[in-house]
């Protein structure tokens, strides 16, 4: 069977008092929904989704899609303006049958909490796992620990897994290459896409990993010609 998979950091516009997917450039929630529909996406990992953005997304998106994943701060922290503004989820959006979902906290101290959302899906008679994450952007030592933690998550279960997210690092990073090699040893491969996905970095910091046995039919990182994010999405069609 074929699957269309995507990852997209939709950018929390934190300079606004509250971000619901709308700013002076337009309605980015609607643009995100159009992107999902126009590309017939089966599974997409979204990073930096705020609660107000998610509320509007749930209203606009086709009801066949489900949005799963908890926020990085508990409800208690929502009483504070700072943590409420930065309370994001790494959601997984899919129209496939969801079996279960769990959100894990990655090593993060003393920086802002980082999470990984894990969802098990039923595809015809097969169960697969999807992991969506967003790693530390400033402190390399913390990001390296997060990479190690993700390897452990993958090793915990032999089920075929899609790993997607904003890793905040490129293939020029030695530790990230060690991570790639570790994943190769447990039969995963990085989608070989080296186009720019962030306006500052010339190489992609957003990545998709899939089982080695899956065939890659098509890869793209489209320029959406809108101000939805400072990232570009990655889309890949695979055959399982």
Give the ranges of each region predicted by the language model:
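Structured beta-strand-rich core segments of catalytic domains in phosphoester-bond hydrolases
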Residues: 43, 47-127, 222-225
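Short, Asp-centered acidic motifs that coordinate Mg2+ and/or phosphate
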Residues: 3, 42-43, 128, 160-162, ...
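Active-site-proximal beta-strand elements of phosphoester/diester hydrolases
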Residues: 2-18, 102, 118, 127-136
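Catalytic metal-binding/acid-base residues of hydrolase active sites
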Residues: 11, 49-50, 97-99, 134-136, ...
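Active site of divalent-metal-dependent phosphoester/diester hydrolases
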Residues: 66-95, 112-113, 168-233
């Amino acid at each position: 069977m074929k699957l269309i998979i995507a990852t997209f950091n939709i950018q929390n516009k934190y300079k606004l008092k509250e971000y619901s997917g709308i700013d002076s450039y337009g309605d980015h929630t609607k643009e995100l929904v159009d992107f999902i529909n126009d590309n017939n996406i089966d599974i997409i990992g979204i990073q930096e989704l705020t609660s107000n953005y998610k509320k509007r997304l749930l209203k606009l998106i086709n009801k066949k899609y489900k949005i799963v994943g908890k926020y990085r701060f508990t409800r208690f922290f929502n009483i504070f303006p700072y943590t409420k503004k930065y309370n994001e989820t790494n959601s997984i959006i899919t129209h496939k049958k969801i079996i279960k979902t769990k959100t894990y906290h990655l090593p993060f101290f003393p920086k802002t909490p980082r999470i990984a959302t894990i969802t098990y899906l039923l595809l015809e008679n097969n169960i697969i796992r999807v992991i969506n994450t967003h790693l530390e952007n400033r402190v390399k030592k913390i990001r390296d620990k997060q990479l190690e933690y993700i390897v452990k998550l993958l090793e915990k279960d032999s089920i075929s897994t899609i790993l997607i997210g904003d890793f905040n690092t490129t293939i020029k990073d030695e530790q990230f290459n060690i991570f790639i090699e570790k994943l190769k040893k447990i039969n995963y491969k990085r989608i070989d896409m080296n186009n720019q996905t962030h306006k500052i970095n010339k190489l992609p910091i957003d990545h998709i990993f899939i089982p080695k046995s899956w065939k890659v039919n098509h890869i793209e990182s489209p320029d959406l010609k809108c101000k939805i994010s400072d990232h570009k999405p990655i889309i890949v069609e695979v055959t399982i």
